[in-house]
């Protein structure tokens, strides 16, 4: 099957963004393209139409290719639950959790068979696969059990490009060192080097490129300028870098997102960040909450542990005081569960078994169970505006029920036409929802922001705006156009 492989000298070299751009470039040239990443470790996930989980980056790459996401595009997804354990998702379904030391003993053979099956299936449906590696292909201590890099390239006999981040320094050493550590048959697959994240005058780089090509015998096929991250990365640590590079001037609204230790699906906030009148700030639980226009508690892979940290740090109490004074609070997925009265984990699914007090801002009680819900949803809104179509997806293991005893039924309302997907209090101050992708829905997002604007005495913005996916299409086209002007794909398509 025809394929291209993209590997990097290090993590964060820009493999995902480059793979995304190549998918759109080739799609525009008439190829039927599919992305592929054999194994991904990420807490940003997407639910396919079949109800399977894949890395969100592979969903974006599929959209860039102009196709719907399939579980075969990311057959193995590892979702960290702690520093030493991960939940294992194979072909979209959770098969358990495992320690890092036991993972390869238990799943290596199954993992490779799954990767082979997925590649064969994709190969029958698409003209070309654009495959992304992970980390570095030259991690000596991990190479014998690497499922994602050169093992895939060799299986496909895929011409491979090596991407290096020049912005962090040491690019030439990274390229030469990586090539030196590859086996001869692996090195033979490297058909080009891409220098990524370049700032400055290109002519100053030319002597280095000439030396590198003479030293390695491999051409530099592209020098990509430094491009602002246009989509959320897979690593929550990059939220700090992303925020520090934000160039927004004074905005009308300031929204604080609590940066939980195991924050999941912070892709939920890309549409908010796209609003020119909104500033999104990610706050550590140890930071001062301040006086934002709204506070959002996001999803998390470890709801109870992150809830306990909020309580220990004082952030939970700060949010409770903020809500009591009329501030707007929104919880999404695990954040929604935290807003309730109780979270119970009788089987110790997340770790320590027990019952834990929530923030008591919404009348729900949640039980963590072993059976995960993962599905796409299409609903109609009741608030902040009646009848708006809302699309999104659920990924959660908790089951929440409304507490009836001692609760005024007029004190809360169903957020959507399915009450199980979220609540809002009678003051429309505290909001909670299980739906990821909520802000992707342009009219709903604007209606919610307009409530905040009204509280500030600001004029409402038009709600007749497109959904974020249309803006995402424009971003993907711009990304592809920029990358295509700096990248020669000829050696990979001949």
From Swiss-Prot:
List the GO molecular function terms. Answer: ABC-type vitamin B12 transporter activity; catalytic activity
Q: Which domain of life is it from?
A: Bacteria
PROSITE patterns, sorted: GATASE_COBBQ
Pathway assignment: Cofactor biosynthesis; adenosylcobalamin biosynthesis
Matches recorded under InterPro entries: Class_I_gatase-like, CobQ/CobB/MinD/ParA_Nub-bd_dom, CobQ_GATase1, CobQ_N, CobQ_synth, GATase_3, P-loop_NTPase
Task: Describe the location of the GATase cobBQ-type domain by residue ranges.
Answer: 252-444
What keywords are annotated for this sequence in UniProt? Answer: Cobalamin biosynthesis, Glutamine amidotransferase
- Gene3D superfamilies (alphabetical): 3.40.50.880, P-loop containing nucleotide triphosphate hydrolases
Q: Name one Pfam family in it.
A: CbiA
Catalytic residue list: 333 (nucleophile), 436
* Single GO biological process annotation from the record: cobalamin biosynthetic process
As for family, the record states: Belongs to the CobB/CobQ family. CobQ subfamily.
What this chain does, per the entry, is described as: Catalyzes amidations at positions B, D, E, and G on adenosylcobyrinic A,C-diamide. NH(2) groups are provided by glutamine, and one molecule of ATP is hydrogenolyzed for each amidation.
Q: Which PANTHER family match?
A: COBYRIC ACID SYNTHASE, DETHIOBIOTIN SYNTHETASE
What name does the UniProt record give this protein? Cobyric acid synthase
Question: What is the organism of origin for this protein?
Answer: Nostoc punctiforme (strain ATCC 29133 / PCC 73102)
């Amino acid at each position: 099957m025809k394929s291209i492989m993209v590997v990097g000298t290090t993590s964060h070299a820009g493999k995902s963004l480059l793979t995304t751009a190549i998918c759109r470039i080739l799609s525009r040239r008439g190829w039927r393209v599919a992305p592929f990443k054999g194994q991904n470790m990420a807490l940003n996930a997407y639910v396919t139409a079949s109800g399977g989980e894949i890395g969100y980056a592979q969903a974006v790459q599929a959209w860039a290719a102009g196709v719907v996401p399939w579980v075969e595009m990311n057959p193995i997804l590892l979702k960290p639950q702690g520093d030493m354990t991960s939940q294992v998702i194979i072909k979209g379904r959770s098969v358990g959790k495992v320690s890092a030391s036991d993972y390869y003993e238990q799943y290596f053979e199954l993992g490779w068979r799954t990767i082979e099956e997925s590649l064969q299936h994709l190969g029958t449906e698409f003209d070309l696969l654009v495959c992304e590696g992970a980390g570095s292909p030259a991690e000596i201590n991990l190479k014998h059990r690497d499922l994602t890099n050169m093992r895939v390239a060799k299986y496909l006999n895929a011409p491979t490009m090596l991407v290096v981040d020049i912005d962090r320094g040491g690019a030439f050493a990274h390229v030469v060192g990586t090539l030196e550590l590859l086996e001869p048959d692996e090195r033979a697959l490297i058909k080009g080097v891409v220098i990524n994240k370049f700032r400055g005058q290109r002519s100053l780089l030319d002597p280095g490129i000439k030396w590198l090509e003479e030293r390695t015998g491999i051409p530099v096929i592209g020098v990509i300028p430094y491009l602002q991250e246009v989509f959320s990365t897979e690593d929550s640590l990059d939220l700090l870098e992303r925020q520090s590079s934000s160039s927004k001037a004074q905005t009308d609204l300031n929204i604080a997102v609590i940066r939980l230790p195991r924050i999941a699906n912070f892709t939920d906030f890309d549409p908010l960040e796209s609003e020119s009148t909104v500033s999104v700030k990610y706050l550590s639980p140890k930071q001062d909450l301040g006086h934002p226009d709204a506070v959002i508690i996001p999803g998390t892979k470890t709801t109870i542990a992150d809830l306990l940290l909020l309580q220990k740090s004082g952030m939970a109490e700060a949010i409770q005081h903020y809500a009591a004074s009329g501030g707007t609070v929104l919880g999404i997925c695990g954040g929604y569960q935290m807003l309730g009265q109780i979270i119970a984990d009788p089987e110790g699914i997340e770790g320590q078994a027990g019952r834990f007090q929530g923030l008591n801002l919404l009348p729900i009680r949640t039980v963590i169970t072993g059976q995960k819900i993962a599905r796409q949803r299409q609903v109609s809104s009741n608030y902040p505006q009646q009848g708006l179509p809302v699309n999104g997806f659920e990924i959660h293991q908790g089951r929440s029920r409304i507490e009836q005893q001692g609760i005024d039924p007029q004190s809360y309302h169903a957020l959507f036409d399915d009450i199980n997907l979220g609540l809002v209090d009678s003051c429309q101050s505290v909001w909670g929802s299980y739906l990821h992708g909520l802000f992707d829905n342009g009219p709903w997002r604007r209606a919610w922001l307009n409530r905040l604007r009204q509280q500030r005495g600001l004029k409402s913005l038009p709600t007749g705006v497109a959904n974020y996916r249309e803006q995402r299409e424009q971003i993907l086209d711009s990304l592809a156009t920029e990358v295509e002007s700096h990248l020669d794909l000829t050696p990979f398509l001949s």
